A protein has these predicted regions:
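Conserved RecA-like ASCE ATPase "motif II neighborhood" in helicase/translocase motors
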Residues: 9-34, 42-57, 323-328
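Conserved helicase ATPase motor motifs in RecA-like P-loop NTPase domains
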Residues: 61-76
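A conserved SF2-helicase RecA2
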Residues: 347-353, 360-442
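Conserved RecA-like P-loop NTPase helicase motor core
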Residues: 44, 294-382, 390
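Conserved Helicase C-terminal RecA-like lobe
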Residues: 6, 174-191, 199, 213-332, ...
């Protein structure tokens, strides 16, 4: 039996199996328990089963403390589920916004009167109202310069954040432990040929990467989404794709090779986003640096094996670790590695921080260097602009103030001229979408 003063430790993955037991537990104690929820960002999706289950079980707890290093990742709406868990749709989370906003058919922002003004956010439809009140626009890969996820009713949102969230940044209590360095690589002739093949001959290569669909109308609607997928893949392993010609390894890999040979003589970690990239760098580094110890970790590696590999990596002087960023996002520390290379971008900064903060710890000695390596004149510039637009919102949630774009760009060592190199989605006279590459139209 659980007596007063005891701690009950449970993982989110177990809540489904223990739902009935926890309901009985909460009822017997009249909800007079203290909930301490670590990594509360795991319930940022208000429609996910995990979120609904957590809220159902613990929303009436008398005391609640939520802790996370990443309150939001992609949108301010991700804050709502955590607020709902804390305040249980009570008078502590009243919607003071008199106007709500939404996107019309032309993707322009329209507004209307808020029927729920001066009432608590409702249990049903509260997340939708939260979005309409504060952040109706959604930044996309092609729409950074148009929307930039503007924040509406800022004063009301700031008031809610100020009374709820206490933020401490890593640099505030640990000092300057790391710096971010951005490198852009000029695509080679072969890489540019891959981009052109994807955009101009997509219908010819579609079957090489995607299975055919019976619903041709749906397949047509997925065209641009699939093109984006291939353009992103072409920024990591273009030499494995249709249309490539030239050197056996891409320009990005060769730049990393030069850095390893002439600058990065100590331990180095390379974070990839796909297994194809991990395999490519494993082959490339074995060929170019046979004298340096090489360690490879993929997502299917068990925890004990992973920890054993990291312990061996720690004991080397000039070892190279190649892994997927997702495989090292939690539960491990590698305090002695000073150089971390982000080979490809994930969809938001917090996800990438979860990876490279495995190497940046409170007790780390010396400066850590995080290298973002991207192709210029490629979809990666859209991705970079997208993650920085999201980071601007994340900063607002942390401190209640709108950070200037220039400050975010400076923090991540990015030139504001990035906007001029973006791929864009446009519509022709017949209503068909096409992709623009810089100032040039490519159907």
């Amino acid at each position: 039996a659980v007596v007063p003063g005891m701690f009950v430790l449970v993982s989110l993955t177990m809540l489904g199996d223990l739902k009935a037991a926890f309901k009985t537990f909460m009822k017997r104690r009249s909800n007079k328990i203290c909930l301490i929820f670590d990594e509360s960002d795991e319930i940022t999706n208000p429609y996910a089963l995990r979120t609904r289950l957590t809220t159902e079980l613990f929303r009436r707890s008398e005391f609640k403390l939520l802790a996370t290093g990443t309150t939001t990742r992609n949108s301010i709406v991700e804050l709502y589920s955590q607020l709902e868990l804390m305040y249980n749709n009570s008078v502590n989370m009243i919607c003071y916004a008199s106007r709500v906003y939404f996107e019309d058919k032309e993707r322009n922002i329209a507004e209307k009167y808020n029927e729920y003004c001066l009432r608590p956010f409702p249990a049903r439809g509260g997340a939708k109202l939260f979005r309409a009140s504060f952040c109706p626009g959604k930044a996309t890969v092609f729409g950074i310069e148009k929307h930039n996820q503007d924040i509406y009713n800022q004063s009301h949102l700031s008031e809610l954040i100020d009374k709820t969230i206490i933020t401490r940044k890593f640099k505030e209590f640990a000092g300057d432990k790391y710096e971010i360095i951005n490198y852009t690589v000029s695509p080679g002739v072969g890489e540019r040929a891959v981009y052109r093949t994807i955009m101009e001959k997509f219908h010819e290569i579609l079957h090489l990467y995607f299975n055919p669909m019976k619903d041709k109308n749906k397949e047509s609607h997925l065209k641009i989404a699939r093109q984006i997928q291939l353009l992103i893949k072409a920024c990591s392993v273009p030499h494995q794709m249709s249309g490539y010609h030239g050197d056996p390894y891409p320009e990005k890999a060769k730049l990393i090779g030069r850095k390893l040979r002439f600058e990065l003589r100590g331990k180095v970690a390379i974070g990839c986003t796909s297994l194809d990239a991990v395999a490519m760098y494993e082959e490339f580094l074995k060929e170019r640096f046979p004298q340096r110890p090489l360690f490879v970790i993929r997502g299917n590696v068990g925890f004990k094996t992973r920890q054993h590999l990291l312990d061996k990596f720690e004991k080397t002087k000039d070892g190279i670790l190649v892994c997927t960023q997702q495989s090292l996002r939690s539960s491990v520390n590698v305090p002695s590695c000073e150089d971390i290379i982000i080979e490809s971008l994930l969809w938001n900064i917090p996800r990438m921080e979860q990876f490279y903060f495995r190497f940046i710890r409170l007790d780390s000695e010396g400066m850590r260097h995080v290298y973002y390596i991207t192709y210029e004149d490629s979809i990666e510039q859209n991705l970079m602009a997208l993650v920085l637009a999201k980071e601007r919102l994340n900063e607002f949630v942390k401190n209640g103030k709108v950070t200037e774009e220039s400050d975010i760009f400076e923090e991540f060592d990015i030139s504001p001229d990035i906007i001029e190199t973006l791929f864009r989605r446009e519509k022709d006279d017949k209503g068909n979408f096409y992709i623009c590459w810089g100032a040039q139209k490519v159907s």
